[in-house]
Amino acid sequence: MHDDPYYEPLDPRVLADPHPYYRRLREAHPVYWHGMLGSWVVTGHAAGRQVLADTARYASDFRRAGIDVPAASVNLQQLDPPEHTGIRRLLVCALHQVPQRAMADRLRATMTARLRALSDDRPADLVWGFARPVALDAISRYLGVQPPDGEEFERYSNAIVRSMDSGLDPSRAEAGDHARARLSELVAGWLADDNQTGFVAAARRARYVRPGISADLLANSLRAVLHAGYESSSRLLGAALLRLARRPGLLDPLSALDGADDLADELVRLDGSVQADGRICVADGELGGQHIRRGDVVIVLLAAANRDPAVFPCPDEVNPRPRRGLHLGFGRGAHSCLGAALVNLQLRTLFDCLRDNGITLTLAGCPEWEDTATLRGLTSLPVQVSIRRKTSAHWR
């Protein structure tokens, strides 16, 4: 394995730290055929960006290549323009109804309360004591609904995450399909409730002026927003806390970084949870010197592309002068992340809360990573949370 760029995504060594494997893949084969996956694997930034942006050739909707897709899986993430355009516009319009100031205030209060509660002589697990509950509350408030039952929702959400690796482990597929159906039922209940406000209510109203969007498509798409908003945010928050515990100087007032937005952008690039995104080729063509045929699956390793030295100087470190907006952590083109603003808000608020409350983070044990390849995330992050001092200064 050390001499061959081939890698097995669920190998414990890869799960613990995939980036050395990504680097060898990128250096040896920016685009290559992975026999076990039965797909092309893309590790370079240029080719990855091309795949994500070209929906005419590389489809998210596998039905365009004649492959059946379960009805419960059809949502805005699995559609391409022009079918994708209507549901995305509907959701973007609904986003404008989210009260941003109230959202920011709520998030700040929640983070501050949890960090203060965790400051003790004993280490705390910041995955379950902070990142997961904060992210669930944030996406629920963003949608304008009460947070679902944490234990049940966590079980369904995790089943969906694990099913994303069903191409590597088929035993994970069935539980994921069941979980998607259950969460779609939850969202359908929200849509049927006349008392709902905010994003969900705005999405329901918008559907009445877009009759081509079915109730099932809207429910499935909101389920995807709920799930992605929770899992992506919570996993990124966990990874950000780990990096900040290892490098507390990142929040130093004398840092060369030009404010919280630059740091947030770099953490998405370096520590974004979404490792890979798949497409299917619907028209023969060339990609990175390889001939890609109709029906071939193409997997873009976003985490590899985001550390491509051809685009990012010192690609494995936080860059004090980042080239913002070039990473693929939020996708590209038609399928760029709807929740990018919420992710950035959570990161900026985390920075402020740590600085304003004089909180220091000290690792108190070895972090543990989940055995999932498509979405990377911590299962445990033991940290000593200490309140060192208080200051009123914070980034704007």
Where do the protein language model's features map onto the residues?
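Cytochrome P450
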Residues: 1-396
